[in-house]
Amino acid sequence: MTQADLIFKNFKSDHTYINQVSKKIFMVEAEEYSDRPVPQDARLGFMKPAMVWAGFTYAYICIFIGSTIMGGLGAPLGYYAIFLGQAFLFVYAGLIGHRAYKFGLNFPMMCKCSFGRVGYIIPMTIIAGLVTGWFAFQAWLAADLMVGLYGGESFLAGTGSGVLPGILGTTGLWAGIFAIIFGCIAVYGIRTMAWMGRAAVVCVTALAIWMIYSLSTIVATETGGNPWSSAPSGEPMTFALGITASIGTFVVSATMTGDFSRWTKSVKQAWGINAVAFPIANHLMLFIGAFYTAIAGQLDFFFGLSMVALGAPIMIIQWVSNGTTCDGCLYNASQGFRNLLLIGKPEKKLSFSWKKITIIVMICGTAVAASNVLNDIVPWLLLISTVAPLIGGILIGHFWIVARNNTQEEVLLASERKVNWPAIVGILSGTAVAAYMITYVPDLPPILGGLIGGCAVYPLIAYAAGYASRGKLTAKGIGAERSGT
């Protein structure tokens, strides 16, 4: 062996060792299974997906949404609306996550199985686009809150102290910076996100407890407010609207729970990680905001704590919570857009890897965040709480009613048919019902439209048209030309 060969051999050995060490440190998994089921031997179990979900749903904006709900309803009605919305999300995400675990499918693949390889283009594009916008908004919000405390004029949080002068005190600059920083976490995949999620859970939980203590002592002493009994102090809203707002906080990602639930190893784990997300983590964020408004009788993005320790604790909470929400949104979006590139040619290996797609989506989201175009949460909540359940309802109807007894092979075979027309009719009918409710029955949550279309209309048409029988897709439902009949 020559000296050059020896050097090359040592280099390869060192390079392999460095890769192994970096994977252990950053928990990077080369295979994210973006376009095929996660096999049982690659499943991560409970803790890592649970930490990703917990960090994801520790969203700072949910504190303000909880505050808004309480301002519109007062206590205790505001607490009831928040709880019912979170209970709905738990059941909704749990049903989708259960089937994602069973078949090892992410959200895009579940959509393809339900709508067909061409039929799923529009719903997948809409959801992936919405969650990309949510990624951009969370990064923008992190920037605007920092500017409102330390910079110049913010969009939502008032005027800052001026510690950050000139361009350093503008929302657009920091929105772009935060979008890149937060987005880079998602580029390294589910395992790195789990590591970040652990840090977020420890940090935000500790600071949340501190917030509740501070609110119940410092703020309550100043205002004399009662957290358990208070009159509405903001824009009045109906109880149904309060529930809808609670659901709207995470109904898009609850619809996409398959991206996380597919990594679990049992049904209990699949339901468990969704329980961590909604009755616990997201509920805590909403509760803090509601608790503050019930005591203080006003809305404030810093919840009366901007002067405590120079605002450092509240700033840490919003950085960490918005950061983990950003990486979860980007991960969801990238799973969707990666699958959209496989339309018509699922067997062909494309040059765009999942990681490259994630970087592209991150760059697009960064541009949107830095442009300051997403500066109002209300339209987003209304849009996502109406659109997402239309698709989630179809997933529930498909995997729990139409194809509940099919095998994984049959379910995947059905994903290769072009269009599942009963599902398309179901989503269109759900859209019509939701539009009718928004226009003529505003006291009812439009979420019901998606559930009616997906869980009632779609199964009825599928059975009537011969696409399904006795909880199984027929040859017609799978695609006769592919089933060999």
Question: What residue ranges belong to the model's regions?
Answer:
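Hydrophobic, membrane-embedded alpha-helices of multi-pass small-molecule transporters
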Residues: 44-62, 212-218, 229-292, 308-330, ...
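Juxtamembrane transmembrane-helix boundary signature
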Residues: 82-115, 124-130, 136-140, 324, ...
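Loop-to-transmembrane helix boundary motifs in multi-pass membrane proteins
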Residues: 167-176, 339-374, 415-431
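Hydrophobic alpha-helical segments and their helix-loop junctions in multi-pass secondary transporters
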Residues: 139, 143-148, 152, 203-229, ...
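Membrane-interface loop-to-helix entry segments
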Residues: 173-215, 271-278, 381-393, 450-455
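Membrane-interface "cap" regions at the ends of multi-pass membrane proteins
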Residues: 2-79, 89, 232-243, 262-272, ...
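C-terminal membrane-solvent junction of multi-pass transporters and transport-like membrane proteins
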Residues: 391-459, 464-485
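Helix-loop-helix connectors at the membrane interface of multi-pass transporters/channels
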Residues: 142-170, 329-360, 402
